[in-house]
Every structure is written in C-alpha cells, then in structure tokens.
C-alpha cells in the first residue's frame, strides 16, 4: 500500500498558551498536516514530539560523506514510539526536520529521518513554540551538504 492510496482530512488541534496539541486521524500524512498547521498558524520556531500508529512510513539515513539520503519505505502495522524534531524556516516557509522511531508487528525497531508517514490509527503530536525565528542554510563549510540552523 503506497502513501498516496488513502488520505484523511480531519486533523484537529488546540492551541493551549503558545503550544499546540494535534490529533491526526487515519489516512492523514504527518509531514503534510504539520506543515499546513505551521503555515496557517504562522509557527516559525517550535519543537515537535509525538506518538501514534502508522501503516506506511518512509524514513531515511543521510550518508554524510556522500551527501545523500537513502530512504526506505516500510508498510504494515507499526507503533510510532517517538517523533522528535524541530520547526524552523527556510526561504520564508516552514521547514520541518523530524526523526521517527517505530516498531513493527514483531516489535522490531526502525527509525531515521522522517520523509513521509501515514497514520493508521491516531497520531498525538505536541508543538512547543518558541518566540523568534531560526532559519536554515547550507553547511557553510561545505562538509555535510545539510541545511543547518542559521542564526541571523
């Protein structure tokens, strides 16, 4: 089953103080929903944490010496045991950098840089916003090819 086969559209959230509590439902894609939320709410700087369940997830490993991501898609029932990441800005738009850990039906762990993740049950995500902005820029030393924090 590919990530594009089933879409949900019922993400709900509540703003409590300066933070957000987000519920994702079956079929919703984590990166799309969180990016949309950040755009709509003007979230420029935040930390992300969450848990949930997925039936299709794409994570990757970045090979620093090759300056290349190696993505891998996983399908089947998975518990998302941890989503951890940040929201910053790149070119004036939200830039989400999230890592995910999950386990499959045999409780074998997978994890890496999150590219896509479709929710199969529910997703429970917290965004802790911070005042100000942090941008992104390519590694100034050219050693990694990564988009690193830019403190302007």
Each PLM stretch: what is its role?
Residues 8-96, 101-152:
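N-terminal intrinsically disordered, cationic/polar leader segments
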